């Protein structure tokens, strides 16, 4: 599928973050396959495998996702996979959550940009 077909924003986030983004209008359930473009992480219940499976689904299997938003504290649980992701689409953006502030030192995209500019 071409880049112009990538029209959705996906989210892997905690309940508060995901709910806020759904209320803002990013929620989508695909009619044909009944797939959601969001995954709610539950602390103490969600496994690393579940996070990784959704990450792979949104970045490799689904061809309609343009941007993947992921809470940074959840991204830490699959850091090596995020660091090794090099495709332009979907773009991965790490975002803060209500209980976990954003740390630019952990952000893979920011690290790549710094390396590119020799910082």
Swiss-Prot record:
<dbReference type="InterPro" id="IPR005772">
    <property type="entry name" value="ATPase_V1-cplx_fsu_euk"/>
</dbReference>
<protein>
    <recommendedName>
        <fullName>V-type proton ATPase subunit F</fullName>
    </recommendedName>
</protein>
<keyword id="KW-0813">Transport</keyword>
<keyword id="KW-0406">Ion transport</keyword>
<keyword id="KW-0375">Hydrogen ion transport</keyword>
<comment type="function">
    <text>Subunit of the V1 complex of vacuolar(H+)-ATPase (V-ATPase), a multisubunit enzyme composed of a peripheral complex (V1) that hydrolyzes ATP and a membrane integral complex (V0) that translocates protons. V-ATPase is responsible for acidifying and maintaining the pH of intracellular compartments.</text>
</comment>
<dbReference type="GO" id="GO:0000221">
    <property type="term" value="C:vacuolar proton-transporting V-type ATPase, V1 domain"/>
</dbReference>
<comment type="similarity">
    <text>Belongs to the V-ATPase F subunit family.</text>
</comment>
<dbReference type="GO" id="GO:0046961">
    <property type="term" value="F:proton-transporting ATPase activity, rotational mechanism"/>
</dbReference>
<dbReference type="GO" id="GO:0000329">
    <property type="term" value="C:fungal-type vacuole membrane"/>
</dbReference>
<comment type="subunit">
    <text>V-ATPase is a heteromultimeric enzyme composed of a peripheral catalytic V1 complex (components A to H) attached to an integral membrane V0 proton pore complex (components: a, c, c', c'', d, e, f and VOA1).</text>
</comment>
<dbReference type="InterPro" id="IPR036906">
    <property type="entry name" value="ATPase_V1_fsu_sf"/>
</dbReference>
<keyword id="KW-0926">Vacuole</keyword>
<keyword id="KW-0472">Membrane</keyword>
<dbReference type="InterPro" id="IPR008218">
    <property type="entry name" value="ATPase_V1-cplx_f_g_su"/>
</dbReference>
<dbReference type="Pfam" id="PF01990">
    <property type="entry name" value="ATP-synt_F"/>
</dbReference>
């Amino acid at each position: 599928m071409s880049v112009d077909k990538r029209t959705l924003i996906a989210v892997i986030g905690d309940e508060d973050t995901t709910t806020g983004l759904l209320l803002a209008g990013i929620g989508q359930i695909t009619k044909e396959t009944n797939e959601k473009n969001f995954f709610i992480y539950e602390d103490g219940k969600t496994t690393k495998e579940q996070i990784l499976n959704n990450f792979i689904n949104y970045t490799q299997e689904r061809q309609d996702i343009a941007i993947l938003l992921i809470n940074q504290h959840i991204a830490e649980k699959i850091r090596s996979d995020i660091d090794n992701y090099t495709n332009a689409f979907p773009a991965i953006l790490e975002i803060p959550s209500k209980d976990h502030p954003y740390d630019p030192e952990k952000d893979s995209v920011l690290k790549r940009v710094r390396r590119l500019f020799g910082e």
